[in-house]
Regions:
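Active-site neighborhoods and metal-handling regions in enzymes and metal-associated proteins
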Residues: 1-218
Length: 218
């Protein structure tokens, strides 16, 4: 219950308007500010960390099986975006503690792979062709953790331009992953390391470098 003139903080970025209206209607005082729980949730405890490591190990096994299957079957040009996404899900389902996908799989070949947050449907479903780049962005919910992995795969020979761009992205990834930095450094301060190889040839990377991943809670 809200007592008269009780001061209650709400985060306007996440709280439903109903709460603000209810507080005011009950003669409470609304104080706007960031939700203090958000920063606490961003730090995993030791149980969540251990679960995340184990979940990623199992997910990595499923993805390694998928990569082998993809390399063997994609050049036949008989696969389509839905079939490939379903096959990866099957490999994950065969592992332990799998609950569901963590989000709808982004499965895009050729031009579809360049569409941000593309969602394949029966109308847009495209067959994979030799020379295509195929993007798969997917993840799983395991009882002990959550995964999210994105990979760009070549069907046959992707050509010199694709190899060059892929190599530049890899250089940026290695530079960022191996950089030593002092405590307190923010992601935005070292983000340029990932982008520099593309910037050097006048290209802009329009995507974010990385993001956090939650833990499955049921």
């Amino acid at each position: 219950l809200i007592e008269n003139q009780m001061k209650i903080r709400i985060d306007p970025k996440s709280n439903p308007t109903w709460f603000e209206q209810y507080i005011k209607k009950s003669n409470g005082f609304v104080s706007y500010g960031d939700d203090p729980i958000v920063s606490l949730k961003a730090v995993k405890n030791h149980v969540e960390l251990e679960g995340t490591r184990n979940a990623h190990l199992r997910d990595g096994v499923a993805f390694a099986r998928f990569l082998h299957w993809f390399d063997k079957n994609a050049p036949s040009e008989k696969l389509d975006e839905i079939t490939v996404a379903d096959q990866l899900k099957t490999f994950r389902e065969e592992g332990a503690l799998f609950k569901d996908l963590s989000f709808d799989t982004i499965s895009g070949s050729g031009p579809n792979g360049a569409i941000v947050h593309y969602r394949v449907s029966s109308e847009t479903n495209r067959k994979l062709k030799n020379g295509d780049l195929y993007l798969i962005d997917s993840g799983a919910q395991y009882l002990d953790g959550t995964t999210d992995i994105t990979r760009t795969l070549a069907v046959g020979d992707p050509g010199d331009e694709a190899r060059d761009r892929f190599t530049r992205v890899l250089k940026g990834h290695i530079a960022l992953a191996t950089q030593k930095f002092p405590k307190g450094t923010t992601g935005s301060q070292i983000d340029i390391l990932a982008r520099a190889p593309l910037w050097s040839i006048g290209m802009v990377l329009d995507q974010v470098t990385g993001h956090g991943v939650d833990s499955y809670l049921g």
